[in-house]
Amino acid sequence: MKLKNILIVVKDIEKSKQFYHDLFGLDTILDNDGNMILTEGLVLQDEKIWKDFLDKDIVHKNNSCELYFEEKNIEAFVEKLEKLYPSVEYVNRLLTHSWGQKIVRFYDPDGNLVEVGTTMS
């Protein structure tokens, strides 16, 4: 068995598709009308459809998980983030951990936590 995809719930699937394409270069593999699979295994799920499946409230900004990406040139990434999405809500602006890794954390347009860090290899 293997983990195939990670699904996040979004209010506006087109806006989220654009966000993940602009910042991470993710492209659409499959669009199933409210369920969109992007490259790298990320799935965007329309909030209304997900709520109907679960019959439970969606809790945005629950800070219980994050999407983690690695980027060699993190300073250039942060510049791109601030240029394309100047109103992004940061959790941590660019910082350097004691072990030398640089990271930045922010919310996507739907409150999903995203971290971008430098490679540690």
Residue ranges of model-derived segments:
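A generic "structured core" feature
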Residues: K17, M36-I37, Q45, V88-V91
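Short glycine-enriched loop/turn motifs at secondary-structure junctions
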Residues: M1-L3, V59-S64, H97-S98
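N-terminal beta-strand motif that seeds the catalytic metal site of vicinal oxygen chelate
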Residues: M1-K15, C65-L67, M120-S121
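Amphipathic alpha-helical segments
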Residues: D12-L26
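Vicinal oxygen chelate
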Residues: I13, L67-L113
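Short secondary-structure junctions
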Residues: G25-L30, S87-V91
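Conserved short beta-strand elements that form part of the metal-binding/catalytic scaffold
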Residues: D27-K61, L113-T118
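Short beta->alpha transition motifs characteristic of CBS
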Residues: I8, D46, S98, R105, ...
